[in-house]
Amino acid sequence: MRTISAIGIFAIAVAPAFAQAPTTAQARDMAATCANCHGTNGVSAGGTDSLAGVPKAETARKMREYKAGNRPSTVMQQLAKGFTDEQIDAMAAWFAAQPAK
């Protein structure tokens, strides 16, 4: 019984190491949650920054700063906490690939 429990605990502990990065379609779907403030496909109509065409590293850095509480915000800190670093990278790459307008 201990062996089975140990195997189960080990499997749970290492599972994140085998998780795959989000696909482009998954990144697009996650990025859609940003549309209310940042516009469709990251093209803002005003009031917030556009994300379309922004370099991946810049968007990912800002999201991680929000997530860590190191960047002031009323909403973004809570939203960013809901994403893993891999998801943040995938969304940042997706926004970077969108044409800026």
Task: Give the predicted meaning of each segment.
Residues 1-4:
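Positively charged n-region of N-terminal signal peptides that target proteins for export
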Residues 6-7, 17:
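Cleavable N-terminal signal peptides
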Residues 8-12:
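Sec-dependent bacterial lipoprotein signal peptides
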Residues 13-31, 49, 60, 65, ...:
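Electrostatic cytochrome c docking/interface patches
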Residues 20, 40, 79, 94-96:
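Residue-level hotspots at or immediately adjacent to binding/recognition sites across diverse folds
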Residues 32-40, 91:
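The canonical Cys-X-X-Cys-His
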Residues 41-71, 77-83:
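Gly/Gly-Pro-rich "capping" loops immediately C-terminal to redox-active cysteine motifs
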Residues 71, 81-101:
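C-terminal capping alpha-helices of c-type cytochrome domains
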